[in-house]
Amino acid sequence: MRRAGAACSAMDRLRLLLLLILGVSSGGAKETCSTGLYTHSGECCKACNLGEGVAQPCGANQTVCEPCLDNVTFSDVVSATEPCKPCTECLGLQSMSAPCVEADDAVCRCAYGYYQDEETGHCEACSVCEVGSGLVFSCQDKQNTVCEECPEGTYSDEANHVDPCLPCTVCEDTERQLRECTPWADAECEEIPGRWIPRSTPPEGSDSTAPSTQEPEVPPEQDLVPSTVADMVTTVMGSSQPVVTRGTTDNLIPVYCSILAAVVVGLVAYIAFKRWNSCKQNKQGANSRPVNQTPPPEGEKLHSDSGISVDSQSLHDQQTHTQTASGQALKGDGNLYSSLPLTKREEVEKLLNGDTWRHLAGELGYQPEHIDSFTHEACPVRALLASWGAQDSATLDALLAALRRIQRADIVESLCSESTATSPV
């Protein structure tokens, strides 16, 4: 009996030990479930990856995931319960700096010249540094413009939100200062007329036969011809007056100038003589022809003994064409926007990113309903500029003024630098 009881007790202990082992293994399996959720059958619910949302949560069945739609929905977490979330829309004065993709939401930022107020979340216009103050921190994202009063030695003569205080101009040794530098205006310098450099003065009472210590002042309107060879100052024996001899280059300059002048005068006289002789022959030929005979063309060539042929009519037409072309190049098409090169207009379209073109349209006189109609076009900026460019008042000056009013000085500088680079001299 005792042996049977002992055997039963051992069996009970073995069963209890097996139950404990199974319980521990079952609890450990549940602890390794990353989601902490289980199906009705005890299976760990799986999580949806980044870019996927839960279409059907687990319960009777396992979790069902679906991919998020680009530019429509996104999911930036790994979850067994979160569905795809709708993308954020950039509205009003906001522009998109990063698009909405499957795993990341869109990132919006305020348009150029605006920043996001942290308290209201709205886009506010950047503060302008007044005259006498300069930029310390630029206006961007959630940071408004930070200005400072220009310290000594710097100035700012323009109110904007992009330029810091500039260092004052320091006049050179050959200049004199007309106006001091102030926090709101730069210093103004003027060239001093050229003078001879004074030499050291010998002590009084000395018997030195050196020349005068101060060279005479040369009037500013007279040009001084620099010498490449140093002036040599000698003293004639028995005389206190110095003898100044110039270098060889100074002696040759008048000779070269005389030869050049003689060549120019001779060439002008030769051309004048040939023209006078040609006119005389033309008059004699015209008198010998009948009255009803057609006069000779103005383009008749004039031959000289040297073999040089001059076509007076061609020269006249060429000069007239050159003057006309120069006048048109200087005058342009009345500075119309449509006269800009295609590449320059495309550059303006690229710079008008985000919703900046809406503000430009308002400055150009378009109503809100007309501005909204441009959004239906494939490229609203190009449609706006094409519509405005067709008007008679669509001048480049009007466009530059509108760009300055919306604080787009970068586009103004681009247009002005291009116009300067291509303008005729």
From Swiss-Prot:
It is a single-pass type I membrane protein. Residues 206-215, 282-292, 306-327 have a biased composition (Polar residues). Residues 354-419 form the Death domain. InterPro entries: DEATH-like_dom_sf, Death_dom, Neurotrophin_rcpt-DD, TNFR/NGFR_Cys_rich_reg, TNFR16_TM, TNFR_16, TNFRSF16_N. One of its GO terms (molecular function) is neurotrophin TRKA receptor binding. Subject to intramembrane proteolytic cleavage by the gamma-secretase complex, giving rise to an intracellular fragment that is rapidly degraded via the proteasome. Keywords: Apoptosis, Biological rhythms, Cell membrane, Cell projection, Cytoplasm, Developmental protein, Differentiation, Disulfide bond, Glycoprotein, Membrane, Neurogenesis, Phosphoprotein, Receptor, Repeat, Signal, Synapse, Transmembrane, Transmembrane helix. It is found in: Cell membrane; Cytoplasm; Perikaryon; Cell projection, Growth cone. Residues 1-29 form the signal peptide. Residues 275-425 are cytoplasmic. The chain crosses the membrane at residues 254-274. Changing residue 262 to I: No effect on dimerization. Residues 30-253 are extracellular. Glycans are attached at residues 61, 71. Changing residue 266 to I: No effect on dimerization. Loss of dimerization. Its main location: membrane. Residues 327-342 are annotated as: Mediates interaction with KIDINS220. One of its GO terms (biological process) is skin development. Changing residue 257 to A: Alters mode of dimerization, but does not abolish dimerization. One of its GO terms (cellular component) is mitochondrion. The modification Phosphoserine is found at residue 312. Low affinity receptor which can bind to NGF, BDNF, NTF3, and NTF4. Forms a heterodimeric receptor with SORCS2 that binds the precursor forms of NGF, BDNF and NTF3 with high affinity, and has much lower affinity for mature NGF and BDNF. In response to proNGF binding, the heterodimeric receptor with SORCS2 activates a signaling cascade that leads to decreased Rac activity, reorganization of the actin cytoskeleton and neuronal growth cone collapse. Plays an important role in differentiation and survival of specific neuronal populations during development. Death domain is responsible for interaction with RANBP9. It also mediates interaction with ARHGDIA and RIPK2. The extracellular domain is responsible for interaction with NTRK1. Homodimer; disulfide-linked. Heterodimer with SORCS2. The extracellular domains of the heterodimer bind NGF. The cytoplasmic region of the heterodimer binds TRIO. NGF binding mediates dissociation of TRIO from the receptor complex. Interacts with RTN4R. Interacts with TRAF2, TRAF4 and TRAF6. Interacts with PTPN13 and RANBP9. Interacts through TRAF6 with SQSTM1 which bridges NGFR to NTRK1. Interacts with BEX1. Interacts with BEX3. Interacts with KIDINS220 and NTRK1. Can form a ternary complex with NTRK1 and KIDINS220 and this complex is affected by the expression levels of KIDINS220. This is Tumor necrosis factor receptor superfamily member 16. It comes from Rattus norvegicus. The lineage of its organism: Eukaryota, Metazoa, Chordata, Craniata, Vertebrata. The gene is Ngfr.
